[in-house]
A protein has these predicted regions:
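Intrinsically disordered, low-complexity acidic/Ser/Thr/Pro-rich linker and tail segments
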Residues: 1-31, 261-273, 330-337
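Beta-strand-rich domains and repeat architectures in extracellular enzymes and scaffolds
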Residues: 21-48
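WD40/WD-repeat beta-propeller blade N-cap
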Residues: 21-29, 66-74, 114-122, 162-169, ...
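Short coil/turn segments within WD40 beta-propeller repeats
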Residues: 27-30, 47-51, 72-75, 93-98, ...
Length: 337
């Protein structure tokens, strides 16, 4: 059920800096995501609701409250590309993934309810790049990742399952379109997942099935997570075969994995190795668990949300070393409210 909210824009301080929004959730907020245009904000909470806000540089307003769909805490939300309409996916402790669409301004409806999609909590959800079609991946504590695919011909949804980590999967992220390039080949969808076995895993869709991407080799000899990997995020790509993935862990570590471009074989520029190595760089070791990592649109900045109530912003220098450039801490948050 959707509750349309009255239009009462709340002005915000015009001074440059963070904008604080009173979400009006009745319990802990677990995720907040901006849409493609940066004009809508979706939040989800342990109160089992999703709230949609219209936002601008100098005001925000609560547009709708989506409630009654999930039977447990809602962990994460994800916006689809606008070519598919105003579409939002949500995942919950109840093992389900729901797809919500704004059919009219301020009016939302569930267009697909994948209930009991998993046998345990669904911890992460993400839409694929629109070039692959309408696909949404979900990571679950039952150790599997599901990929929902919309069949436009008959308006139905199919599902593929990946058996990932037996201990559970906390997050999933898609490779951006253009992340990998091979002449005369259509780019295959790829995923990276965050597991409760302290590892990240890469997956590729080939010949009608999802398999482990054996072309990616991770160098874990010096830097690795020592506890659950809580989140993983594939950076936007500016050049093919120049990829970065950020992961964060319960142990407080944030690692940036950087692809080493495939080397030429025997000096032949048209022949490359069939695999690529990924080198890890420890961005920082926090004193508290790190829950979320998120890239800027260009992939130049990385936001990190940790258990110390701080959100920090990081940027890599020309030498490859990461440095903190900004922070939003609990003290400033309380002052802003």
């Amino acid at each position: 059920m959707t509750t349309a909210e009255p239009s009462n824009p709340v002005p915000v301080d015009a001074t440059p800096g963070p904008i604080y929004i009173d979400t009006q959730h009745e319990d802990m907020v677990h995720d907040a995501q901006m849409d493609y245009y940066g004009s809508k904000l979706a939040t989800c909470s342990s109160d089992r609701t999703i709230k949609i806000y219209n936002v601008s540089e100098n005001a925000y307003e609560l547009s709708a409250t989506i409630q009654g769909g999930h039977e447990g805490p809602v962990w994460q939300v994800s916006w689809a590309h606008p070519k598919f309409g105003v579409l939002l996916a949500s995942c919950s402790f109840d093992g389900s993934v729901l797809l919500h669409q704004e059919v009219r301004p301020r009016e939302w409806t569930v267009i697909h309810a994948a209930r009991h999609l998993h046998e345990s909590s669904v911890n992460g959800v993400a839409f694929a790049p629109h070039e692959h079609g309408l696909l949404v991946a979900a990571a679950s504590s039952d150790g599997r990742v599901s990929v929902l695919q919309h069949e436009a011909a008959n308006n139905t949804w199919g599902v593929h399952y990946l058996t990932d980590c037996p201990l559970g999967v906390n997050a999933v992220s898609w490779a951006p379109w253009g992340a990998f390039y091979q002449a005369d080949q259509v780019e295959a969808p790829r995923l990276v997942t965050a597991g409760c076995d302290n590892q990240i895993r890469f997956w590729i869709y080939q010949e009608g099935q999802w398999t482990t991407d054996s072309s990616i080799v991770l160098d874990v000899t010096e830097v690795a997570h020592k506890d659950w990997v809580r989140d993983v995020a594939w950076a936007p790509v500016l050049l093919p075969n120049h990829n970065m993935v950020a992961s964060c862990s319960e142990d407080g570590s944030v690692i940036v994995w950087t692809q080493v471009p495939p080397a030429n074989v025997d000096g032949d520029e048209n022949t490359q190795e069939s695999f690529s190595q990924w080198k890890p760089t420890l961005l920082h070791k926090f004193d508290a668990p790190v829950w979320r990592v998120s890239w800027s649109v260009t992939g130049h900045f990385l936001a990190v949300s940790a258990g110390d109530s701080d959100v920090t912003l990081w940027k890599a220098g020309l030498d490859g070393a990461w440095s903190q450039v900004s922070t939003v801490d609990a003290q400033s948050t309380s002052q802003g409210q």
